[in-house]
């Protein structure tokens, strides 16, 4: 019996306007080819998900726990580019069971993340997968040496399992090849020969061969790692998988606001990723994850336990845990310059807008949107202060105002003397928030030195607001007030006024 560790597809995966519910065709096709488990039950608190699989056709219960390391206050651990999976298999039958738990990963180096992957996909081709065993793990290292090192889509991925004797199909051509590999698994699989020949991917002699060399133009390889198991009745075993990645060359790939600058032509602007300065490649990420596995799991689950064991209701726990999800989604990133950057959100199949369906929406560090966000300051206050530094050092205009959008890279001219867009002039609620957030930064441990360095800029901003909207000093804001609604408010109103209320 060959089954995907996936619940049976539902008839109508409808989603709300804030969640993508589109299931890719390749996933439904694979589910039909491999079959799925009859039942799948989800539980968990972000960033930990637990799924229990069961099926009357299987004498096994399977429990999967998956997480990405996340520790409040520790930015580096919380931005390790990896996914960590633990599968616990338990024999629920009356007889011994043997099988293979396999994971597969597409070598996506060169893919733009947008073009549909088919028989011939531009960007793919020349992809290379390599086997690496050692330290109790079996790995497939994936990259594309045909790309220049500076290419936006150059990078590396690693799929690994914590069984050095796992059967590895490093270069799998597709779903049918994968199915043939899984169907060929035998109890007498020849693993003993790996002791003297560790470079063999699959030690089983009567099994499908893998591909060889770089992938053909427009094509790529899957990497497959299969861990064999034998379980007596009532016996269980836990198998760990990880997938790690490293794509250093983040570029500006969204349309920025403000006036057009045709003089920039077709220039591609580099932003990079901070994690790429800590790790030279994905194999280094994977080495770190393997070495620190127990620590990373313990520190991550300590956070979720803090929530779930509190006096909060389950609904409140879910609400609070969800707040950190967007900070660690593609909405946000830390560039190679060490600055924290955040879009207003992420685009997708159910969240499309004028700028399309891919990437981040409405760049960048929008003060009139991020002013209503609180998780960053509570969980990673250094990143919150990082945003203040950008607002004061880069975005602030000579007259003290702060445009509500950042243009990147930050060495480009900012929108201090041009129409910004959404709204056209600097958003007042965003500027008021910068002052209030500076107070919160102090309350969260920024220190007197930070305040002393920022005080002149805070005063300039305060005076700009007071002179333009509260010239009579009565503590009430007057006039046209650009806001987060991408429109201007007019006259006295509590929405904007309660952000002011000076002593």
Where are these regions (language model features)?
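Polysaccharide-binding surfaces and accessory modules of carbohydrate-active proteins
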Residues: 64, 69-196, 225, 256-311
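Extended, loop-rich substrate-binding clefts of extracytoplasmic carbohydrate-active enzymes
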Residues: 18-82, 174-225
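Short, hydrophobic/aromatic-enriched beta-strand segments in well-ordered soluble domains
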Residues: 53, 64-66, 101-105, 235-247
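Ser/Thr/Pro-rich, low-complexity mucin-like regions
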Residues: 89-93, 97, 232-252
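Substrate-binding groove/exosite segments of carbohydrate-active enzymes
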Residues: 204-222, 228, 235, 239-240, ...
